[in-house]
């Protein structure tokens, strides 16, 4: 019994019937509003399917009357008479209540015990869970500048058609210079969801409370990471694709322009990360039917060239089929317009049906997240954000952040956790969260650090080996060559030393010893990496940690 009570969140919640009121004064007036009496419950009967559904519906009704809270008195007869329960029956009844609460996305918040004629009477406060049980799909959006990435996402998440001027991109490009120039300069994040298999749009996408409600209410939440299409900011695009633990890539191609060198570059990054990809041929309202067909054909040829199987999605049945069978090899292609709305319902259907990889194994591992952004919030303090790679972090946890330039990790506390402005008690693998931390200043932190539990095997690595493929290089890569290398959210200058031969050229594969030039980073075997500097580019996998 004590072990169960110790697992309950002990914080007090404001209620019309506070937990400190005299229990007899409340029960003598009978059941009403959010108050329910239960003499005893047992899992053998009350958790059978039909009875469980009835009791879950009853609990949901009581919570609605209590503005999200219900008060259950256990060991109490329907007429309000205090009977009491043995310790075994008390614990069994609590177990059933907890199981029912999980059915309606709620949790047991507090328990009081009071003496009665034949044992103990309990007063149990049940409230909405701060960790809604929903599926979370993370989609990275890539493509050339002006091909309509932000406009498509803005229209998709709001249901508001664009006028043709790209106005819906304002829902994502929130910096003044981005709005004025119509160009995204950093990663942007957007969200929408599905309830009862119906799309839920944001009526006011700039309202943080509305984003919060999407996370709270929807059974499936789709988060978009909108990357940058302008070539000078390619590093930011790489960070968006490599550093966010994405489930799928959405590659956007203008129906008039067709695939460009940037389109091919972004596709290459997505494929290097071994990520399933969807292609949206956008702005079909601005091109002739013949040109749309030509661009579709160009996209198909490009996908086949890199060993993928394009699949044209023309109907809801096609969307259902490809979602059921999609993998790294099959690439659905859709024709869409943010102005006319053509193809948007097919995209909705695809995102609704797409499978989310199981994170069961990741949840068993110690918590770890790579830092993507660092900022200070008035009244909150220092916040780090990123995608949780594995495990689960809870409010109140002690975690490590690092490594710093000397290779050390510092201990900090987790004050609060948010996902799309929705306050949560925890964050888990696959979720994009902001974590408010104590005892750390912004100047002590940098992008590419990890936040992790003390039982995660965090280590400051200076040198490692990788198996790489050189895609493009104007000359040869020799000992001492330097290049920016991306691993997760890390973007650091690395010194190369070929191991199998004296030098590597474009088209070569080989082992390379790499050394972070300025500071150590926390990496491990098996991680994907991309390097790009000037006209040089390649990708690979970390195979061995040296030190």
Positions of predicted regions on the chain:
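Polybasic/polar functional segments that serve as interface/processing modules
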Residues: 1-132
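Active-site glycine-centered loops adjacent to acidic/histidine catalytic or metal-binding residues
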Residues: 282, 337, 534
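Short glycine-/polar-rich loops that comprise or flank the Walker A/P-loop
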Residues: 32, 70, 244-248, 273-277, ...
